[in-house]
Curated annotation (Swiss-Prot):
Region annotation Disordered: where it falls in the sequence: 798-827
Binding site for ATP: G614, P615, N616, M617, A618, G619, K620, S621
Name recorded for this polypeptide: DNA mismatch repair protein MutS
Annotated InterPro entries: DNA_mismatch_repair_MutS, DNA_mismatch_repair_MutS-lik_N, DNA_mismatch_repair_MutS/MSH, DNA_mismatch_repair_MutS_C, DNA_mismatch_repair_MutS_clamp, DNA_mismatch_repair_MutS_core, DNA_mismatch_repair_MutS_N, DNA_mismatch_repair_MutS_sf
Record's compositionally biased regions (Basic and acidic residues): 818-827
Gene responsible for this protein: mutS
Assigned protein family: Belongs to the DNA mismatch repair MutS family.
Keywords: ATP-binding, DNA damage, DNA repair, DNA-binding, Nucleotide-binding
GO MF, any single term: ATP binding
Superkingdom of the organism of origin: Bacteria
Pfam families the UniProt entry points to: MutS_I (PF01624), MutS_II (PF05188), MutS_III (PF05192), MutS_IV (PF05190), MutS_V (PF00488)
Length: 909
């Protein structure tokens, strides 16, 4: 049996689009067949039927109405599928043989730009990864806005993951030579789909394509890897969109060293744009700072948060603009009120370029442009360099406003192919056709009255539908009065009959002819208007960029005003000083004015590493994150939550706090911790800010203490490091390092003990904490008193029998001679030699132990520490275990299990 011609055509098109679900246009429906039908029926909850296809078995089939396609496409794209739209390319009524069909567009997670799919305040990035000579080019494009950026770095997992975490692409076009371990690492951390292409796809017409796409592109300004990597992304956009998008007209190359570097773990721990717990914006730094009034402003603010600056002049220009805006509140209110009426010009430009814009959206563009002169007049009052530059560069697009105001109706139809979109007076022919259509309505009314008089039937009506056109409807009770010669019967219904007359058909031809011509002409005129606007895309995009910038600046100003922020002093080196600093997010989540502020001094000398001790729940982690967030806010140009602040520009921020995501992927707590610490020590500089929380807690007490000590020593003594560091720990023995290792300074969280209870004062004070208050914290967490009372008895017994000589200070001085050896053994010599999680997971047990020691500290140093004077290892370990119990992260059952374990250990001593 042979396939039917239509099914043969379907399979030919499908063969060219194997990785897509093919929407095949048949009349008023998109149909899917075979495996596509089975997939779509399952994912879209459609009824799966069948169709004769010329084979022995019917082809599985399901379909959707063409006018509802976007809803179904969005659902498939969200699930990671690609959808190819195969349209009829000719009028079926005029086709000779089978109707010509082909794919006119391919929708993918990284290229789909329907409003129902996109988030207004987020970019929808498509990414390419291109590998060449141990370098990797990463390019990012947002088809909906025209944003196109790229960079290249040394080929390693951490660098790739860090860049992806900034842009959060929905889809990655990847060269087939990329290692599978990189793809696996990306899939584990991000919800992203992949499209694999070969080297030829990236090379095809590279320089020519970029010259044609980007007007300012000059080949000599870019390395070959950038040209090839960007071309792969551009080729994919053209392949899926089936056209060149002229709003993608600027290639922005950036160096990663031009921005404050924040690795993927630090972004997560600092909750810059979403929370750790539920991935929501509320509770993040972005949530606090976002008072933007436009969608494009919100997207730009997100970029600023994701890519803080390191150049002092640019930071101060932003600061000065924010300061000037907030100093004139009435002007700020006017600015905000007018920005609220500005639509998403950036994405409108994308719709104009992709030829998907409708008349209502052009009306939104007109109304937005109408506010530009008022906004520019407001900006004229400002005198800072950045605001003056925005004022002088802002194009109010008056000519486009005039064009749209003269051409588009105030309330146009949604569809651009059904008329009702062009104003009277814009096109003479349209006016004439409208007159004919209007007279036709009068003719119909006149003819209806005429027929009533002739027949004497008062209920006679002239009606219209798409099947019969115009017809005369007469009720059955009046059928005996119908003229026999003139009335031609067309349809009999239960209560009436429908007729036509020669005169009625003549009027119909005139009316419908005018209507069809009018709809066709209005569509053609609309296309002409769209093309005129399309020629000005560059101007529109530039205006959108400037409006976005002023929106972000006013947002930072209103936040500073409402939250009592101060303007930080920006320095290239010296001390980082914060007076009465506050956590920007936490203070918004608790009652007003109840947050306890704290001071901070960090430098590369006496206050290089702040060793912070204190009980769980006291606020150590909040304080450390607070310092990092204040630094980051200052480097995006924002004011900061502090009475005063002097911020030294950081090149990198690192945090080692928690390992929940990696534990969920089956990685051991200790290995996650050591891998992250090694990454920090390998990549930090003397301009970096490091946050380390409970380093060493994932292994035995003495190994952990040894590692923590060695890490402190390495950070403070290595001449190439000396990073500003906040180091929170439960190892109280480490407080003896103050005065022994230059740069170490003890701080603790103030706690007030009342009887058997404790009160957290949330204040950072000089000096180390005297105890951990683990049992008291357990009581606060709701552990039954019988448990905490028994734990206290056990703790007292253990403390009575524990050795008293816990001072490690003398060891710290004797170990300084071995620092050179530590420098090479605490971490691996280069990032390329750091074992990945998966490699470590596959090691045998004895090799895991060797890897832990190799990453952390040499065995002989650990032995030295054990000789410090801890005579009874088991008892001391049990005391430490009890005092450092993290109740907040345990269930009630876990608490009882832990207590049972402690009792058994105590009995065995």
């Amino acid at each position: 049996m042979a396939l039917t011609p239509m099914m043969k055509q379907y399979l030919e098109v499908k063969e060219r689009n194997k990785d897509c679900i093919l929407f095949f246009r048949l009349g008023d429906f998109y149909e899917m067949f075979f495996e596509d039908a089975e997939t779509a029926a399952r994912e879209l909850e459609l009824v799966l039927t069948g169709r004769d296809c010329g084979l022995e078995n019917r082809a599985p089939m399901c379909g959707i109405p063409y006018h509802a396609a976007n809803t179904y496409i969005s659902r498939l794209i969200t699930k990671g599928y690609k959808v190819a739209i195969c349209e009829q390319l000719e009028d079926p009524s005029k086709a000779k043989g089978i109707v010509k069909r082909d794919v006119i567009k391919i929708y993918t997670p990284g290229t789909y730009s329907d409003a129902s799919f996109l988030e207004e305040t987020k970019n929808n990035y498509l990414m390419s990864l291109y590998l060449e000579n141990e370098l990797v080019c990463m390019a990012f494009a947002d088809v909906s806005t025209g944003d196109f950026q790229c960079t290249y770095v040394k080929y390693n997992e951490s660098s790739i993951l860090d860049e992806i975490s900034k842009f959060m692409p929905k889809e990655i076009v990847i060269i087939d030579s990329i290692d599978d371990t990189i793809i696996k690492a990306i899939k584990e951390r991000f919800e992203v789909s992949f499209t694999v292409k070969n080297k030829d796809f990236f090379y095809l017409n590279a320089s020519l394509n970029l010259k044609n796409q980007f007007p300012d592109f000059k080949e000599e300004n870019y390395d070959d890897i950038v040209i090839t990597g960007c071309n792969g992304l551009l080729n994919y956009i053209i392949e899926t969109q089936k056209t060149t998008l002229i709003h993608i007209n600027k290639l922005d190359y950036y160096e990663t060293v031009d921005y404050l570097s924040i690795d993927i773990n630090s972004r997560r721990n600092l909750e810059l744009t979403e929370t750790l717990r539920d991935k929501s914006k509320k509770g993040s730094l972005l949530w606090v700072l976002d008072k933007t009034t436009t969608a494009m402003g919100a997207r730009l603010l997100r970029k600023w948060v994701e890519q803080p600056l390191i150049h002092k002049e640019i930071i101060e220009n932003r600061q000065n603009a924010v300061e000037e805006i907030l100093n004139n509140v009435p002007l700020l209110d006017d600015l905000r009120n007018n920005l609220k009426d500005v639509y998403d010009i950036e994405r409108l430009a994308g719709k104009i370029s992709s030829k998907t814009v409708n008349a209502k959206e052009l009306l939104s563009l007109k109304n937005s442009i109408g506010n530009l002169p008022i906004i520019k007049k407001i900006i004229e009052n400002y005198n800072t360099d950045l605001l003056k530059n925005i004022y002088s560069s802002l194009d109010c697009l008056e000519d486009l406003y005039s064009l749209l105001d003269n051409s588009i109706l105030p309330s146009p139809a949604l569809s651009i192919k059904e008329g009702g979109i062009i104003k009277d007076g814009y096109n003479k022919t349209i006016d004439e056709l409208r007159m004919a259509k209007s007279h036709g309505t009068e003719w119909i009314a006149s003819l209806e009255e005429q027929e009533r008089n002739i027949t004497g039937i008062k209920s006679l009506k002239v009606k219209y539908n798409k099947v019969f056109g115009y017809y005369i409807e007469i009720t059955k009770s009046n059928l005996n009065q119908v003229p026999e010669n003139r009335y031609i019967r067309k349809q009999t219904l239960a209560n009436c009959e429908r007729f036509i007359t020669p005169e009625l058909k003549e009027v119909e031809d005139k009316i419908l002819g005018a209507q069809e011509k009018l709809m066709e002409l209005e569509y053609n005129v609309f296309v002409e208007i769209r093309e005129l606007i399309e020629k000005e895309i560059y101007r529109i995009k530039n205006t959108a960029k400037l409006i976005s910038s002023i929106d972000v600046l006013q947002s930072l100003a209103i936040v500073a005003l409402e939250s009592n922020y101060s303007k930080p002093i920006i320095k290239l080196d010296g001390e980082l000083l914060i007076k009465d600093g506050r956590h920007p997010v936490v203070e918004k989540m608790i009652p007003r004015d109840s947050f306890v502020s704290n001071d901070t001094i960090l430098d590369n000398k006496d206050h290089q590493l702040l060793l912070i001790t204190g009980p769980n729940m006291a606020g150590k982690s909040t304080y450390m994150r607070q310092v990092a967030l204040i630094t980051l806010m200052a480097q995006i140009g924002s004011f900061v939550p502090a009475k005063e602040a002097e911020i030294v520009i950081c090149d990198k921020i690192f945090t080692r706090i928690g390992a929940s995501d990696d534990l969920a992927r089956g990685k051991s707590t200790f290995m996650v911790e050591m891998w992250e610490v090694a990454n920090i020590l390998n990549n930090a500089t003397n301009k970096s800010l490091i946050l380390l929380d409970e380093v060493g807690r994932g292994t035995s007490t003495y190994d952990g203490l040894s590692i923590a000590w060695a890490v402190i020593e390495y950070i403070c003594k290595d001449n190439n490091l000396k990073s500003k560091t906040l180091f929170a720990t439960h190892y109280h023995e480490l407080t003896s390092l103050e005065g022994k290792i230059k740069g170490v300074k003890n701080y603790s969280i103030a706690v007030k003990k009342v009887d058997d209870d404790i009160i957290f004062l949330r204040k950072i004070i000089e000096g180390g904490a005297d105890e951990s208050y683990g049992i008291e914290v357990a009581k606060l967490a709701g552990i039954p008193s019988v448990v905490t009372n028994r734990a206290k008895e056990i703790l007292n017994t253990l403390e009575e029998n524990s050795p008293q000589n816990n001072d490690i200070s003398k060891e710290s001085s004797s170990s300084s001679n071995s620092h050179d050896k530590l420098e090479s053994s605490v971490i691996k010599e280069s990032e390329s030699n750091i074992k990945t999680y998966d490699e470590i997971s596959n090691l045998e047990t004895n090799k895991i132990k060797e890897a832990q020691v190799e990453v952390a500290v040499e065995k002989e140093v650990t032995q030295d520490i054990k000789q410090i004077g801890f005579l009874d290892i088991e008892k001391e370990a049990l005391i430490k275990e009890i005092s450092s119990i993290d109740i907040l992260n345990m269930t009630v059952k876990d608490c009882f299990d832990k207590l049972y374990d402690i009792i058994n250990k105590a009995k065995s001593l």
